[in-house]
Each structure stands twice: as C-alpha cells, then as structure tokens.
Swiss-Prot record:
SUPFAM superfamilies tied to this protein: Periplasmic binding protein-like II
Originating species: Oncorhynchus mykiss
Secreted listed as a keyword: yes
Signal peptide boundaries: 1-23
Location in the cell: Secreted
Name by which UniProt lists this protein: Otolith matrix protein 1
Gene: otomp
Lineage: Eukaryota, Metazoa, Chordata, Craniata, Vertebrata
Family per record: Belongs to the transferrin family.
Summary of the tissues where the protein is detected: Expressed in the sacculus during the day.
Length: 367
C-alpha cells in the first residue's frame, strides 16, 4: 500500500505541475494606434524589468470592433473600451469585463448626461420637447446623440421609421437644432439629413464652416452646446454634468462664458420637473459608466490578477498617464485613479439607465 500511495502522490504532483506549466501566463492587449502600441510596449518592458509575473504582449487592431473580434477568437485577450463599445462587445461578441476604471468620483461612474436650459425659459419640459430647439455637442456621441435621442425614443416622443432613420426623426421632431457633423458625408452619405439639424449652428467668425464636426463651428463640443443655449439660439443643451463648471469662474475666457451666471441656468429632469445645476445626481438623463477592460468570460480572473499586479507595482503614474506620447488616453483614460475588479456582468456595469438608452437603437443592427 505504501508503494501505491507514493506512486499516486507522484502522479498527482506531476499532473499539478503539468497543469500549472500549461496555464497561459501572457496577456495580449489589443491596441488601435501607433502611440497606444508604443505605450503598451513600454509598459511591457517596465513590467519585465520589475519581474512582474506574467508577460504583457501588444496586438494591433484596426478599431474597437476589430479588437472585439480578436478577443473573441483568442488572438488578443483584453482591451479597455468606452461604454458604447462595452455594450457591443457583450451583446454581439459574448465578452465580459475584468476591470473598470475609477476616477475621483464614485466607482464605476464616468459622468452624468444632463439637459441644460436657461432659467428664464418657461413652459419647458423634457416630456414636451416637440418643436423646441436643441443644442448637441456633435453627432453620434454618447452625450450629444445616443443618450438624448434614446431618451426621446423611450418616452415615445420620437418614433423611427422602418429604415431606422434617426436624423430624419430628430429633424422632424425639434423645431431646429445644432448637431455638428450631421451633414458631413460620413454621417449623411446621401445628403438627406434634415437641414433643420444645422439651423442653430453659427460656424466660425466669418460665418463659414457652419455645422462642421470640429471647433470651426463655434457651437461644437460641450462648451459650444452650452454657448448655443447661453446665446438664446437653443432651448436645451445636452451635455455632461461638468460642462457648466468647466466654463465658469474664469475657466473659459470667451465673452459669452464670462457673462454667464450660475443662477441663469437650470436642469430639466426626465419626469418633467426642473432642478438646479448642482442637482445632477438626481436630475439626469443617464449615468454613463466608466471605461472597462473587455475580456473573454473565462479570462475575467486571470486578466484582473495581472492588472492588479501591474497596479500594485506602478500605481497611476506609468499605467494611466500618457504624458510623453502623441495622444491622450492610451491603454486607459489619463484621468484614471485606479482600476477596480468587475465581478458582475457587463450589463450590471453599464447600469439600467444607460442600457435602456442603448436599446432604443437596436434597429441599427449593432451585430
């Protein structure tokens, strides 16, 4: 019996050794630009120099969607993605999340999307926006398009035709708007998007480049949408909750911003009520979740443990900062304070309000 026990013990030990030795110890990170690839290679070199267990490899992808495909088929293991891409990765590719970015606010939350209006605007309600005028940072963005239009669809204020033509539905709904980029060839290849979606735009100082998808349009971006409302060219601006404070108290030296007072503004709430500019936690269209690391479901634990080792070794200096590179937000958002483990599903990370908004666009066939 002793010989049998020793043989059994030796067999179990050999099996354990083989199992351990065949475990995948490398993490292949999907990157989508030359600058991101360089930061990935630099981080990999630093990790090797620190003798951190595991190996970081860098795999070049063409786009977030290409990275999703690579992660699904095993040619890459992980990539950090925005909220819209997380939904696509989970819904279309069956992927999950290993870690999420945390900023200086509440864990898992990136920002709130709010509807901002002048306090002097009376009889204004988010439940009765038909023929009102609207200001959007730009076309096809979370803040400027996905969240506000999704809200209008989900509250049955807008209905989309069989062709899933959202620009037409939005143009028919609002009296006039400024949606920079809506007439660009990329977003309007047939030239059929309604002209009303550009009528609150003003272009540059020479009144050229009206409604273009860049800063030559003075109503472009978060500050531009706020300016659109401040100058009384729009009834409501759809912006991040931080936009007001980013453009006041000397943070924006343009004349329109210098003349703006906090008491001049209010938030419009989803239930039709109003609130003050500081009340974004209770008066918002959606909570947009922070970026997160997309992986195959079976790799949630393995990828998290490697990221945890990197984080413990480097903190937020080497891992999160993109200083010294030609782009920002490489591998992770520059504003990331730390990574936290995602134990639940991708839908729990996205949250109910944001997931509901995205479901309004299912006719666009994400998959």
């Amino acid at each position: 019996m002793d010989r049998l026990d020793r043989r059994l013990a030796a067999t179990l030990l050999l099996f354990s050794f083989i199992s351990f030795s065949t475990q995948k110890t490398s993490i292949s990170w999907c990157v989508v630009s030359e600058a991101e690839e360089q930061k990935c290679l630099d981080l990999a070199g630093s990790a090797t120099a620190r003798n951190i267990r595991g190996t970081l490899l860098c795999v070049r992808g063409q786009s977030p969607t290409d990275c999703m495909e690579k992660i699904k088929n095993g040619t890459a293991d992980a990539a950090a993605m925005f909220a819209d891409d997380i939904y696509t990765a989970g819904w279309c590719f069956g992927l999950e999340l290993a870690a999420g970015e945390s900023y200086n606010g509440v864990d898992g939350i990136s920002y709130y999307v709010v509807a901002l209006a002048r306090r002097s605007s009376s009889d204004l309600s988010l439940l009765e926006m038909h023929e009102r005028s609207s200001c959007h940072p730009r076309i096809r963005t979370t803040v400027g398009w996905t969240v506000p239009i999704g809200f209008l669809v989900n509250t049955s204020q807008i209905s989309v035709d069989e062709q899933c033509n959202f620009p037409k539905a939005v143009g028919d709904f609002f009296g006039y708007s400024c949606v920079p980029g809506v007439k660009d060839r990329e977003h309007d290849p047939r030239g059929s998007n309604p002209k009303y979606l550009c009528e609150a735009c003003i272009g540059d100082d020479n009144e050229r480049h009206i409604c273009v998808n860049n800063h030559r349009e003075r109503h472009y971006g978060e500050a531009g949408a706020l300016r659109c409302v401040a100058e009384n060219l729009g009834d409501v601006a759809f912006v991040k909750h931080t936009t007001i404070f980013d453009n006041m108290d000397g943070n924006n030296m343009e004349s329109w911003a210098m003349d703006l007072e906090l008491e001049d503004l209010k938030l419009l709430c989803p239930d039709g009520s109003e609130a003050g500019p500081f009340d974004h936690e209770t008066c918002h269209l959606a909570v947009v979740p922070a970026n997160a690391v997309v992986v195959r479901p079976e790799d949630k634990c393995r990828v998290w443990k490697y990221l945890e080792r990197l984080q413990n070794a480097f903190g937020n200096t080497t891992m999160f900062s993109s200083v010294g590179y030609t782009q920002s937000d490489l591998l992770f958002s520059d504003s990331t304070h730390h990574l936290l483990r995602v134990v639940g599903s991708y839908t729990s990370w996205l949250g109910p309000s944001y997931t509901t908004v995205l479901q309004a666009f299912e006719c666009e066939s994400l998959c």
